[in-house]
């Protein structure tokens, strides 16, 4: 089974349990770009229909903007703490191919990148 298929199965199994909250740690980290895009679309669709609260760890700024209502940015190690919280106020449902065309996307992206650079 490919890595992408294993990720799909893992996400499907998690949602099949009907959790009230879902914790995801770099769920797309080991995937190629095409598989990542497909799974992002699947995750957005499932979240739209299931309305499950999810907490996700990611280092991908664009992924964070697409999937999040709030992005909690952590300071560096070894004593990491909350450094900033960005409210992402983009309309839902979000479509991956359209989010980057929204006028506020690059404002959010710039805010996140600025935090990461300092």
What is the predicted function of each stretch?
Residues 17:
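Conserved signature/switch motifs of ABC ATPase nucleotide-binding domains
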Residues 77-107:
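Conserved beta-strand-loop-alpha-helix hinge in the C-terminal portion
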Residues 2-8:
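ABC ATPase nucleotide-binding domain "signature motif"
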């Amino acid at each position: 089974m490919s890595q992408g298929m294993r990720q799909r199965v893992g996400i499907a199994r998690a949602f099949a349990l009907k959790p009230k909250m879902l914790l995801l740690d770099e769920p797309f980290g080991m995937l190629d770009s095409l598989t990542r895009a497909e799974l992002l679309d699947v995750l957005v669709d499932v979240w739209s229909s299931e309305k499950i609260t999810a907490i996700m760890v990611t280092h991908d700024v664009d992924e964070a903007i697409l999937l999040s209502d709030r992005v909690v940015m952590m300071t560096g190690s070894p004593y990491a703490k909350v450094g900033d919280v960005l409210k992402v106020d983009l309309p839902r449902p979000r479509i991956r191919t359209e989010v980057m065309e929204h006028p506020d996307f690059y404002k959010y992206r710039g805010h996140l990148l600025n935090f990461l650079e300092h």
